[in-house]
Amino acid sequence: MGTAEMQGRLWGPGARDWSELNEPSCVPFYEAVFDAIAVRPGTALLDAGCGGGFALQLAAKRGAAVTGLDACGPLLDIARERVPDADLRQGDLESLPFAEHMFDAVTAFNSIQFASDLLAVMGELRRVARPGAPVAILIWGAPERCKSRVILAAIGGLLPPPPPGAEGPFALSAPGKLEELAEKAGLVPERADEVPTPLIYPDLDTAVRTQLSSGPARMAIEYAGEPATRKALAAAFADSRQPDGSYRQDNVFRYLIARA
């Protein structure tokens, strides 16, 4: 099973919860990136790994002509509900189904690190961007600045050891690593910045439900069962409880803007 096929299978069962409970929390970094690359009326934008289309919806409200690609059919169905006029394709980040130089801007929000061939993905993002167009890649910031690392660790603790070279969600978070990859793919790094993005849940049930909808959690469920996965997530959230009963995890995300 290829990477795209596997990711599509894992993210499908929780697509509705992920798109409705998690994606709205990402507005701070969606908007920061769209501001940085000047998304405006008429911008031909590709979001690679678009999920349920929340970012595409925001870009469309700015007047952009939006295109999205994702491996997960159920997430794309939700994206179609949100952005009926978008051009949405199911496919693989490592082999984008688009001609060369199609887009004025390309974004990838926390998606490329799930691919098996990172260099191939970056090369594809460059290929479909018009010469000189911005390619914006957003990833987790340094693990020590991301409280949600405890959630990722809890899920990882239920899984068998990853294959050699599989570095997980923080695969590109080390200083300079994303820039180095971009340069190898023929992109020209222009600027990088960080966006604080807290994840806030009204109660523990919502917090656990949100994380259970992710692809990595689905993999943990397949290996360890849902009760064990729920228990591990609840324990990981324990020290994020706020006085009002809500749960908050402060995180920093980092984005790079490079030119094709």
Segments the model singles out, each with a brief description of its role:
Residues 6-7, 25-26, 52-54, 171-260:
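Conserved Class I S-adenosyl-L-methionine
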Residues 1-43, 54-58, 74-78, 82, ...:
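Conserved class I S-adenosyl-L-methionine
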Residues 119, 126, 132-202, 218-219, ...:
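Conserved catalytic/acceptor-binding region of the Class I
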Residues 104-119, 141:
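A short SAM/SAH-binding and catalytic strip from SAM-dependent methyltransferases
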Residues 94-105:
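A short acidic, Gly/Pro-enriched loop at the edge of an enzyme's catalytic core
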